[in-house]
Amino acid sequence: MNFEELFSVSEKVVCVTGGGGGIGRGIARTFVSGGAKVYIASRSDLSDVAAEISEEGPGECLALSVDMSSEESIKKLVSDLQELEGKLDVLVNNAALGGFIHAFEKFPTNEWDQMMNANVRGPFLLVKEALGLLATAATSDAHASVVNIVSVDGIRVAMDNDWAYGAGKAALIQLTRQ
């Protein structure tokens, strides 16, 4: 087996949440450049982004919808992937909610709930729901993979009252260790 075969993603099916910009978009582009079929999922319509990434080829990029704070939306995403592909080789939990900056004693409970739902509960539910698709893709020669994108904020002391984001990323780090 040569290097290209060992690390090939050609014909793999990949789902990247939060794939419209930044890290997620970069991950999607990289998989497409390796020949994978990539689904980018977001609350926003990413059809134009997917078309742009697909042009770079040789793989393909398509857009799906998901709200990582909604169990119903997560189940719909997995159902769509099941219908379209029947398997999932790689799941990248990249979508995250941030920007709620408050001192601890002034942090609104509803913002805490929104952040934890999107950044911890959502990835947990998505992995749980996608286990069947991941198991279908796995073979004795090639395992399916889950990649949870976290942050240094999950392991360091919070700066500028951004502690809630860090708490969520710390929880995701622990979830990943399971």
What function would you assign to each model-found segment?
Residues 34-49:
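Conserved glycine-rich Rossmann-like NAD(P)H-binding loop of the short-chain dehydrogenase/reductase
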Residues 127-128, 177:
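A short, exposed helix-loop element centered on a Lys and neighboring polar residues
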Residues 20-21:
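Conserved glycine-rich cofactor-binding loop
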Residues 65-76, 109:
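The beta1-alpha1 cofactor-binding region of Rossmann-like NAD(H)/NADP(H)-dependent oxidoreductases
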Residues 139-171, 176-177:
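Catalytic loop of short-chain dehydrogenase/reductase
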Residues 12, 58, 87-88, 134-152:
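Active-site loop of short-chain dehydrogenase/reductase
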Residues 102-104, 108-113:
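Substrate-binding pocket helix/loop in short-chain dehydrogenase/reductase
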